Amino acid sequence: MDSGDQEHERGITIPAKQTSIFYGDYKINIIDTPGHADFSGEVERTLNMADGVLLIVDAQEGPMPQTKFVLAKALELGLKPVVIINKIDKPARRIAEVEDELSDLFLELATDDSQLQYPIYYAIGRDGKSWKEIPANTDEDADLTPIFDAIINDIPAPDVMEDGAFQLLVTSLQYDTFQGKYAIGRIARGSVKRGLQVSLMKNGEVAGSARIEKVFGYRGLNREELDEAFAGDIVALVGVADAHIGDTIADKEQPEALPTIDIEAPTLSMYLGPNTSTMKGREGEFTTSRKIGDRLKRELETNVALRVEENGIGFTISGRGELHLSV
């Protein structure tokens, strides 16, 4: 699902992404979040669309520092965990030790006793294989059925209201030159279709109105237009140009705000200004304070963990770490 140039270059997930698949009679929404703590804002803004979490851990490396952060956030929200120990075909695998490390991690982070009971599955993700028990031979035929069954059996269905007026919390924004801005979120109540008149709510107050021009859903790696979407669906709405992350989009006849997204404060700051060297104007794409400001303003629309303050001819940028700021 990683599609950005920097994601391919660095081999990491940066912005969270969403899709859906169908398994039997079930539609499963999937959210891919970054693992690195520097992109924790992406985790915080998207976890409220989830009902459970697949915690994927390397069979050799075990839980990493970023594993602790993501799991802590998931458990704070009461999400049901399903543990997957991946890459069990590695020669240096240490499955028993990794299970003990996971047990210690859950003991440290669990907010109630029920979170100490979690299913563990074993997988070779590259080959599309998974097992409920450690296989005697990883070359045997297998598929991902055990994990899909775990999602159905162990993770609860969305806690949404099928009836009532439409309500959605914006958790992500995307753009393209054809449709403009997409406001993305999970429908918390009711349904939405093209032509619906909605109110845009900021900080619990109505801040404007709009008309839904198009409704898109996600399936596989594609975004597809829908006639109508219902409570529990993750959708992208076109027509609400003034929407920002944390806003509520609600039926104009019954505008009720959802709780906004809580994002932790930045931990690191840097100063960024225009080039003042003798090479100014000869290199770089954004060489003036105005161009830098415009670019940072666009970044703030989607990067919820970033803070920008104008400081003379430059800007003080605050984020979650060196990797976050460098990206």
What are these regions (language model features)?
Residues 1-327:
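Structural and coupling elements of P-loop NTPases
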